[in-house]
Amino acid sequence: MTREEWTRDLILTGYVDERGAYTISNIKSAPNGEFGMAMLCVKGEELSIYDTDFSAKPGRLMYTIRLPEITDVRLSTFALHPTLKFTYQNFRWSFMAGFGKKLPISELFASLAGAKTR
């Protein structure tokens, strides 16, 4: 399945909106100590974080984060170490991998970083 087909499927099943902003990433820091692979999906003003595995299909919903409430966004699309970090409800979240320069989710967080970086 191509990335375009996968994006269309996620839109049709309601995981993401028409922007197609999603990625598979590794959780480095989450409030309850979770780690490992996760699927990050953006729909409206919410970032949903789903458990996933190598099938790359969304599993159990772990967190829902309101995008307007995140602060101190840091995004690196450097090929060897792409990372996303932000603060939400006094916790510093961290994810590694899955943030290529031209991906819709990277563009979305880059715009948030420009608007909200302290």
Predicted regions and their residues:
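Anionic N-terminal interaction surfaces
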Residues: 1-44
